[in-house]
């Protein structure tokens, strides 16, 4: 029974494969029912239905039996992937795509694929098999042989099959298929829809086809086994997250996606309205709404939230993305760590991985000092080591070091001059000079030192460095023949940032050269805590403006609250305040971050006005939040995990585009529908927008 929806009358028509009788310019359809009660439809309504919906199907100049082409979909008995040896002898009905088709003598073999798997079917050319076509322009010629007619069935066409499950001969069992022990002997094969030549084959290796082409025809790319697997795992993980959080007494609440513009950090997408000068913004996160839910007594909230940020894109970013967003009342950091570790372990278990250790903690100072980045990959070594004390600024003959160490610093500890290095252990001679050139090209402030035999140093500084300096560094770094040393000198924030990026670049280079091997199923989780609450816009300028390290709603560390409230505090004092912020990191990827929030309106107002020095009109944008905080707001905190990024880690992909059904390109374009698109002048005028 086919069910067609009339747009105008909103009446469901149940077409029962009964004759359609031409009556002047209208159709008389038999057995017309509504979803509730039987209705009489006027000829005019049916004329409209005929004109709008059957124009491309019915050719009035041809005397054809339309009824033969009307589909009568019978419920399938099995999906393609669920038929097993337990079903041998049963008659089954399946639907799917023709994945492959081979003519082998007296048999034609078809592998049929649906969203649940694949199954092999065969047509015995010596036996009776009914072939049908429901495609208007493709007819089965009864005069032709089955072999001739089956040529009409192209790869990726949609078919239905009715047949009997039989056991494969033992030598023909395919252990690579879940249905490899059986096959279906076809009694009836019906073509439901044909397929034109595709831009690429569904069986292709993704590296053999450009990503641009795959995204343009994403609906074809989605048929690939790998993409199907990714999307289905994403669904399973989402359900596991919901179940876990609901069991932890959370409730799921949807917050608005039309918000008001607020200065939270990243650039927002603005949504014009038909009211002149009035704009919505798409939320960068549900941050303010979820805090307001805590004011409203929701206690524990979560949602799989859609978020939007108009920023430069990379492989792990999209203009619209999803996060597992959470907020809790009457909570401290330890409670959040415990809940999130439990959630992460649950989600990894759903994907087939067992995480059985407690996540270690690092302070922000520790990770920057040791790894040069606040989201370190701890699966490999190459730690930053401070060798500043190996040089005396008054005695060293290395002018670069002498000048750098003589530079004055200010009250920002990040401006202090340092010399740091990382060691590439036993990489020579595989690591060639061209590779070292690549490293220095990537960062021109890096000095390379190759350790040759007899502790000979090959470097730009080898003639200037003293034996004492060389000995101190050799002992500090435990240098051996075949090692490479990468040195950077300058203000601390520059040195650590440079070496942090160089460490990542070197790790990728060493992986390409098979000098570093990482297990794709090794997951090194860690927490980073004690971030600075505020960050100077310029470490070299003591009077530079301060920015929120994360967002302006993060609460200060209890031990540092006096620095925030002291009216005599300076920017350098504010920069020493630690925030109650925490990031969860895995294998060099920030999986999520959160904080305990400011729940007092006076403290929140001081942050906005006195520390961040927002203009009054900017502060006014937060009036709704400030008012709510003054009306009995409980202490609260929360966190958000990047759901797309989480799923990409579970499928061992470097790009979140691989786990999103319809992703944007790195340029923010959606190639399939050519989005974003231009609009007409009249549409712009309606929104009071002027195109320059």
From Swiss-Prot:
Q: Where in the cell is it found?
A: Mitochondrion matrix
Binding sites annotated in the UniProt record for L-aspartate: 264, 309, 597
GO biological process per UniProt: aspartyl-tRNA aminoacylation
- Which PROSITE patterns does the UniProt record give? AA_TRNA_LIGASE_II
What range does the transit peptide cover?
1-61
Name the domain of life: Eukaryota
The reaction(s) annotated as catalysed by this protein in its Swiss-Prot or TrEMBL entry are: tRNA(Asp) + L-aspartate + ATP = L-aspartyl-tRNA(Asp) + AMP + diphosphate
Q: What are the annotated GO cellular component locations?
A: mitochondrial matrix; mitochondrion
Enzymatic class: ligase
SUPFAM superfamilies on file: Class II aaRS and biotin synthetases, GAD domain-like, Nucleic acid-binding proteins
| HAMAP family the record matches | Asp_tRNA_synth_type1
What family is this protein classified in?
Answer: Belongs to the class-II aminoacyl-tRNA synthetase family. Type 1 subfamily.
Q: Output this protein's name.
A: Aspartate--tRNA ligase, mitochondrial
Source organism of the structure: Dictyostelium discoideum
Name of the coding gene: maspS
